[in-house]
């Protein structure tokens, strides 16, 4: 507590931005300077054996900095925003208690937002019979059909939730069915109450340069063995799981199921990655109060470090 008897909020630095913009290197540089530990804010890096397609941080890249929320689930296991929220808040508490700065880095907007704001996830008002009906419809008539039903009652949630994320599409429909309230409206009510003392940094760059980096990253992933990584999952019989809906996996799965050629799969992977980057930027700009740093002309580590020091009233190792 401070002198006024108020509970001091935990300090958290957050680095967000589109895929391939350079978040990983920045986060490690900042962690070294600010005595920090890193929490992944990526919903797919949680999966073991899914390393290349998720651009998972390597041991070498970590350079001794502790990382959390990486490799905590098997690919066939499901994972919810609510579980992410609970685990990450626990890590924030524990890192703070050790006298370190929690640094969340990633591009999965809703997951990060659920941690920072007063989001409350409740399954109490569920309707199992309705849920089963929707699951049956998704199987019989396709995921797009169920997603279209969501568009009719809650277009905001439909815009945010991809059609392939059937579980979340059905959950949003279920909330509307049981409460008459849109999931998007429920979330909006919870979007204004920050739980932490947050410095929220966003990285951006010239769109064409970003798209070139994304295309190059896909080529590098293929050279590193993405095809073999996905083949391993496919040969293990992993199908219809949350994990393989990720960009980088669903496209290569189409190749293994003879829907497309390998060349077409790689081309689609690049297209989907570019579209995802665009959606990420739009989402962050619309949903969160981000201080943006343009890294088109090179990294801005020193500038960002000074900003975080000022915002969170910290002193870095570099300024001692």
UniProtKB/Swiss-Prot annotation:
Residues covered by region (Interaction with substrate tRNA): 42-45
Binding site for substrate: 19-24
List of residues binding ATP: 17-24
GO biological processes: tRNA modification
Cofactors demanded by this protein: Mg(2+)
Reaction(s) this enzyme catalyzes, per UniProt: adenosine(37) in tRNA + dimethylallyl diphosphate = N(6)-dimethylallyladenosine(37) in tRNA + diphosphate
Record site: Interaction with substrate tRNA: 108, 131
Pfam family, one: IPPT
Family membership: Belongs to the IPP transferase family.
PANTHER family: TRNA DIMETHYLALLYLTRANSFERASE (PTHR11088:SF60)
NCBIfam families recorded: miaA
Subunit structure of this chain's protein: Monomer.
Protein name, as recorded: tRNA dimethylallyltransferase
Organism: Bacillus thuringiensis (strain Al Hakam)
């Amino acid at each position: 507590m401070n002198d006024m008897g108020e509970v001091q909020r935990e300090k958290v630095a957050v680095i967000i931005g589109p895929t391939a913009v350079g978040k990983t290197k920045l986060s490690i540089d900042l962690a070294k300077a600010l005595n920090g530990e890193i929490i992944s804010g990526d919903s797919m890096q949680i999966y073991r054996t899914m390393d290349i397609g998720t651009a998972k941080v390597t041991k070498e890249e970590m350079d001794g900095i502790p990382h959390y929320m990486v490799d905590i689930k098997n690919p066939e296991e499901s994972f919810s925003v609510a579980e992410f929220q609970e685990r990450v808040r626990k890590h924030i508490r524990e890192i703070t208690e050790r006298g370190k700065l929690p640094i969340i880095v990633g591009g999965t907007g809703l997951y990060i937002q659920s941690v920072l704001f007063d989001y409350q996830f409740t399954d109490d008002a569920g309707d199992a019979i309705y849920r089963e009906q929707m699951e049956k419809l998704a199987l019989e008539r396709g995921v797009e059909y169920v997603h279209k039903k969501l568009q009719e009652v809650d277009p905001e949630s439909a815009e945010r939730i991809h059609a392939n994320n059937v579980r979340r599409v059905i959950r949003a429909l279920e909330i509307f069915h049981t409460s008459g309230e849109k999931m998007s409206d429920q979330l909006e009510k919870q979007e204004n109450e920050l739980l932490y003392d947050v410095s929220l940094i966003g990285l951006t760059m010239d769109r064409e340069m970003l798209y070139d980096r994304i295309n190059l990253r896909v080529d590098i992933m293929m050279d590193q063995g993405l095809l073999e990584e996905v083949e391993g999952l496919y040969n293990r019989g992993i199908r219809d799981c949350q994990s393989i809906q990720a960009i980088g996996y669903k496209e290569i799965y189409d190749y293994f199921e003879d829907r497309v050629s390998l060349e077409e799969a790689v081309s689609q992977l690049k297209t989907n990655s570019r579209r995802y980057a665009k959606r990420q930027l739009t989402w962050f700009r619309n949903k969160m109060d981000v201080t943006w740093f343009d890294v088109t002309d090179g990294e801005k580590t020193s500038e960002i470090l000074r900003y975080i020091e000022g915002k969170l009233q910290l002193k870095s190792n570099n300024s001692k």
